[in-house]
């Protein structure tokens, strides 16, 4: 183990991990011991500033160095030690502090609270200077709060719609309350920062927005299902109210076309009869258009529905017949084979079992029993 970090080999080693027996810099210490829960339990402390190979146990206040047990003993208990501080006190009388160990991934502020000598910036040792200059991604609650406030300042109220904008200012303030980011996000999408609530529809498009009239006309939804009326002789057939004249604006997507006659579309409600020509259809400027015509979507039951209903009725009738037969059953005691029973009644037995002819027996049904 040397002066540099055992993991990256670029930064100066600052802490010593007893479980891994490695000297690490603060950055590598955080990245290595934040991998899983087991590594977070490793106990670490400062590395000795004399040998750079053992964990430091004490801190010499006079010399401002962290020492391991061996370096502390050799430096303060050896009478011939020439590395004493500038003060008049002997090395044996130097004030020493015990260095605490830590585990997990503490922030720089938490490390400063564990090692209080890190707060004394005057005359710092190399170890303390490295600790002060090291930049760690702190996870403390104060840093999180500051970070969240900074992000909030970027998102909220940074680029609301100015009052001098060409977009009319309506009664809606939802877009202003939410706020938008001052970046090229909307520019990349080709979108303008306008109020998406469509409450300023009249000022934006110069016309009133009435969804029911735009979609269905003045007749409402019933106008979709009007069939052709009989036209006078010599005249053309009259189309219902929901004809090709009542279409939505081509700027709104997806475009829904309501036609009075079956057209070339993916969804079509058939049932309207009459002559049709290529001129009766109007193409819509959209890739996916839905055209509704003629009959409403609620149809009378089909043949398949009738078959399912009849099958259910047949099954219910069969169950009823089965229950009636079950009630009429008789559970009387019957003799299945009368001839076998007649022969068994006259055979001789021994302890209730049949015996062959000529063998000893203790019961003969043909012999009259005596009553003593």
Swiss-Prot record:
Pfam families: ANCHR-like_BBOX, CCT. Transmembrane segments: none annotated. GO terms for cellular component: nucleus. Disulfide bonds: none annotated. GO terms for biological process: circadian rhythm; negative regulation of long-day photoperiodism, flowering; regulation of DNA-templated transcription. It is found in: Nucleus. GO terms for molecular function: DNA-binding transcription factor activity; transcription cis-regulatory region binding; zinc ion binding. Its main location: nucleus. Zn(2+) 1 binds at residues 5, 8, 28, 33. A zinc finger (B box-type) spans 5-47, 48-99. Residues 315-357 form the CCT domain. InterPro entries: CCT_domain (IPR010402), CONSTANS-like_Bbox1 (IPR049808), Znf_B-box (IPR000315). The keyword Cell membrane does not apply. Keywords: Metal-binding, Nucleus, Repeat, Zinc, Zinc-finger. Zn(2+) 2 binds at residues 48, 51, 71, 76. PANTHER family: ZINC FINGER PROTEIN CONSTANS-LIKE 10, ZINC FINGER PROTEIN CONSTANS-LIKE 9. Belongs to the CONSTANS family. This is Zinc finger protein CONSTANS-LIKE 9. It comes from Arabidopsis thaliana (Mouse-ear cress).
């Amino acid at each position: 183990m040397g002066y540099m970090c055992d993991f990256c080999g670029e930064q100066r080693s600052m802490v010593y991990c007893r479980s891994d027996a490695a000297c690490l810099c603060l950055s590598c210490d955080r990245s290595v011991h934040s991998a899983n829960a087991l590594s977070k339990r490793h106990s670490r402390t400062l590395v000795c500033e004399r040998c750079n190979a053992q964990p430091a146990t004490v801190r010499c206040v006079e010399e401002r160095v962290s020492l391991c047990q061996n370096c502390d003993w050799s430096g303060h208990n050896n009478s011939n030690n020439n590395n004493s501080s500038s003060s008049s006190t002997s090395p044996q009388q130097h004030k020493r502090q015990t260095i605490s160990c830590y585990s997990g991934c503490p922030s720089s502020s938490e490390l400063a609270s564990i090692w209080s000598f890190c707060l004394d910036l005057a005359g710092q040792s190399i170890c303390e200077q490295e600790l002060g200059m090291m930049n760690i991604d702190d996870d403390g609650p104060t840093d999180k709060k500051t970070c969240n406030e900074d992000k909030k300042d970027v998102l909220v109220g940074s680029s609301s719609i100015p009052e001098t904008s060409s977009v009319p200012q309506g009664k809606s303030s939802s877009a202003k309350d939410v706020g938008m980011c001052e970046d090229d996000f909307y520019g990349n999408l080709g979108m303008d920062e306008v109020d998406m609530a469509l409450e300023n529809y009249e000022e934006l498009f110069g016309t009133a927005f009435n969804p029911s009239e735009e979609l269905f006309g003045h007749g409402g939804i019933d106008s979709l299902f009007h069939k052709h009326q009989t036209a006078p002789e010599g005249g053309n057939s009259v189309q219902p109210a929901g004809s090709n004249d009542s279409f939505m604006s081509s700027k709104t997507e997806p475009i829904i076309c309501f036609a009075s006659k079956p057209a070339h579309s993916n969804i079509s409600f058939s049932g309207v009869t009459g002559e049709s020509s290529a001129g009766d259809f109007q193409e819509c400027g959209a890739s996916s258009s839905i055209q509704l015509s003629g009959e409403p979507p609620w149809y009378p039951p089909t043949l398949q529905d009738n078959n399912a209903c009849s099958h259910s009725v047949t099954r219910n009738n069969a169950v009823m017949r089965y229950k009636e037969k079950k009630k009429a059953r008789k559970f009387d005691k019957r003799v299945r084979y009368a001839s076998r029973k007649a022969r068994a009644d006259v055979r001789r037995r021994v302890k209730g079992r049949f015996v062959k002819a000529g063998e000893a027996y203790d019961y003969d049904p043909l012999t009259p029993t005596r009553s003593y």
